[in-house]
């Protein structure tokens, strides 16, 4: 029997729409509850330092109302770690962050920033958080994740999602497969995400070593036309179909 693949729904872009007009709606808290009701295994949200979408209020309320779990993405900065200490998220994912980027552009470079990342991992673990590191599918970065004490990694799938040819997409898929296998051999829990949508998720979902996919933009975009609950259910269905064809 194949291990179930979990779905974490990222609700950042519900907040993006709200912040565009400075209104109280649409409310990410309601979105989190609806996604959870539709079958999401967890809710992911990225509170950026510039507060362009998710606000502190959102994080506090979502943590209170969720029946599943909250995965808080945050930069490795003193301000964000102080906030995490206040919230004590069940799961925290350290991500790179640049103010000028539209979305996260790559994985965390643990090799370059090892001391800072290691201190952040320890601090979060002392809060009781399970820590993951958002990294590129690179063996050296995976080894570094083990070295700094992170039990979980999330593989950046952006290069796969952005590939403009079948050859390039196949190459990036193989990179992710090999990285997932390598990480699993080191006893890491392996998640993945970034840029995944309804037309490219199945090959990723079929990777047996993956534990969870975090998907946001595609689900929120689909929700405009069919509603959030249906969008979540459809993504889950595609992921489950992909797992049916994975050999034990």
UniProtKB/Swiss-Prot annotation:
The protein's Enzyme Commission number: 2.6.99.2
InterPro entries recorded: Aldolase_TIM, PyrdxlP_synth_PdxJ, Pyridoxine-5'_phos_synth
Biochemical pathway: Cofactor biosynthesis; pyridoxine 5'-phosphate biosynthesis; pyridoxine 5'-phosphate from D-erythrose 4-phosphate: step 5/5
A GO CC annotation given for this chain: cytosol
Disulphide connectivity of cysteines: none
Residues annotated as binding 1-deoxy-D-xylulose 5-phosphate: 12-13, 48, 53, 103
Location within or outside the cell: Cytoplasm
Gene3D superfamilies registered for this protein in UniProt: Aldolase class I
Record function comment: Catalyzes the complicated ring closure reaction between the two acyclic compounds 1-deoxy-D-xylulose-5-phosphate (DXP) and 3-amino-2-oxopropyl phosphate (1-amino-acetone-3-phosphate or AAP) to form pyridoxine 5'-phosphate (PNP) and inorganic phosphate.
Residues with site note (Transition state stabilizer): 154
One example of a Gene Ontology biological process annotation: pyridoxine biosynthetic process
Residues of the active site: 46 (proton acceptor), 73 (proton acceptor), 194 (proton donor)
Residues bound to 3-amino-2-oxopropyl phosphate: 10, 21, 195, 216-217
Record lineage: Bacteria, Pseudomonadati, Pseudomonadota, Gammaproteobacteria, Legionellales
Alphabetical UniProt keywords: Cytoplasm, Pyridoxine biosynthesis, Transferase
GO molecular function: pyridoxine 5'-phosphate synthase activity
SUBUNIT field: Homooctamer; tetramer of dimers.
Name this polypeptide is given: Pyridoxine 5'-phosphate synthase
Main location (coarse class): cytoplasm
Source species, domain of life: Bacteria
Family: Belongs to the PNP synthase family.
Catalytic activity: 3-amino-2-oxopropyl phosphate + 1-deoxy-D-xylulose 5-phosphate = pyridoxine 5'-phosphate + phosphate + 2 H2O + H(+)
């Amino acid at each position: 029997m194949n291990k179930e693949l979990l779905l974490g729904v990222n609700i950042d872009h519900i907040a993006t729409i709200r912040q565009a007009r400075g209104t109280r709606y649409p409310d990410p808290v309601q979105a989190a509850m609806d996604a959870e009701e539709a079958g999401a295994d967890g809710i992911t949200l990225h509170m950026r330092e510039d507060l362009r979408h998710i606000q502190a209020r959102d994080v506090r309320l979502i943590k209170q109302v969720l029946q599943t779990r909250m995965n808080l993405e945050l930069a490795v900065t003193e301000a964000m770690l102080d906030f995490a200490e206040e919230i004590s998220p069940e799961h925290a994912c350290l991500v790179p962050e640049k103010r000028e980027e539209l979305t996260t552009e790559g994985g965390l470079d643990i090799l370059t920033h090892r001391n800072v990342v290691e201190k952040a991992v320890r601090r979060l673990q002392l809060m009781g958080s399970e820590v993951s590191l958002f990294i590129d599918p690179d063996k050296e970065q995976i080894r570094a994740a083990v070295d700094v004490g992170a039990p979980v990694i999330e593989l950046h799938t952006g290069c796969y999602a952005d590939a403009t040819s079948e050859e390039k997409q196949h190459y990036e898929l193989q990179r992710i497969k090999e990285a997932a296998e390598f990480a699993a051999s080191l006893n890491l829990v392996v998640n993945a995400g970034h840029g995944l949508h309804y037309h490219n998720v199945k090959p990723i979902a079929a990777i047996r070593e993956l534990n969870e996919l975090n998907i946001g933009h595609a689900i929120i975009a689909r929700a405009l036309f069919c509603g959030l609950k249906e969008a979540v259910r459809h993504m889950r269905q595609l992921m489950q179909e992909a797992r049916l064809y994975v050999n034990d």
